[in-house]
């Protein structure tokens, strides 16, 4: 166990793995998985490690997916992109804008790789991946069989997909298909974007505004290790939301399809006066309460303790129980993040 995982997770938590393998194509990925499995080892496939918290040393092989490549098909109604899972997400967003293919600008600066984007159904500022996803290409690890799932088959939900359930361990994502409509329509429902004029705004202006909001509010993982939003924004019933708003009328709330209401986890945490709170080397970020940071050589236990404290305080004040968006990795694979911090 002497391969440090510190360079492979944006939290900068220092645990080890038995083996770390970089796979630059599908065959290398399959070979690494099949070799490790034959040895009886657990296997974890990572992109940029921007949404994981390692709780302890990993007793197996970590495969870093570095499958690259971007192919573009120009159709009358849309541009269709076939993108390797190992491509950096933000670089893809910049590239599509430079090439005059807008549609991803609200998702600028989301850390991580393209292959991770469907797992979480990444989203920001009113847009989720499912809006632009055409398909996801996977490989069945045991057989090498290729499978293409349509966007519908991916069963996208809020920070959720089939890749967190049936497809979690048996398949690896090798490419993502995107469909960017030529009739561009800006999404200006959140934050500073609401100030932009929908009749004159350009994709580049939306991109610039999103980048500005993210860089001013969110810490740079190279300075303070973090995994972006630590908690999901809770989605509650209309009754729960109504009761909460009666008591806290200024609480941000976003009605969802089906009658439920999404609340802002960052606001709930902020109302508990937790910004800047520190436990061991972990802290709640001072600008954006939704982000927990590695302030000073944090151990995973520090982050877990802090997350538990935040969850308890918010639960006691609002009777709303936050769930981590970050995936928790134990010695032999993913464990329940909610149970870990409960």
UniProtKB/Swiss-Prot annotation:
Catalysed reaction, written as an equation: UDP-N-acetyl-alpha-D-muramate + NADP(+) = UDP-N-acetyl-3-O-(1-carboxyvinyl)-alpha-D-glucosamine + NADPH + H(+)
Pathway participation: Cell wall biogenesis; peptidoglycan biosynthesis
EC number(s) reported in the record: 1.3.1.98
Domain FAD-binding PCMH-type: 13-183
GO cellular component: cytosol
Protein's UniProt keywords contain Flavoprotein: yes
Gene3D superfamilies: 3.30.465.10, UDP-N-acetylenolpyruvoylglucosamine reductase, C-terminal domain (3.90.78.10), Uridine Diphospho-n-acetylenolpyruvylglucosamine Reductase, domain 2 (3.30.43.10)
Superkingdom field: Bacteria
GO function terms (MF aspect): FAD binding; UDP-N-acetylmuramate dehydrogenase activity
Keywords carried by this UniProt record: Cell cycle, Cell division, Cell shape, Cell wall biogenesis/degradation, Cytoplasm, FAD, Flavoprotein, NADP, Oxidoreductase, Peptidoglycan synthesis
Catalytic residue list: 159, 229, 325
Chief localisation class: cytoplasm
A Pfam family assignment: FAD_binding_4
Gene Ontology biological process terms, A to Z: cell division; cell wall organization; peptidoglycan biosynthetic process; regulation of cell shape
Protein family per UniProt: Belongs to the MurB family.
PANTHER family associated with the record: UDP-N-ACETYLENOLPYRUVOYLGLUCOSAMINE REDUCTASE
Function: Cell wall formation.
Annotated protein name in UniProt: UDP-N-acetylenolpyruvoylglucosamine reductase
Organism expressing this protein natively: Shigella boydii serotype 4 (strain Sb227)
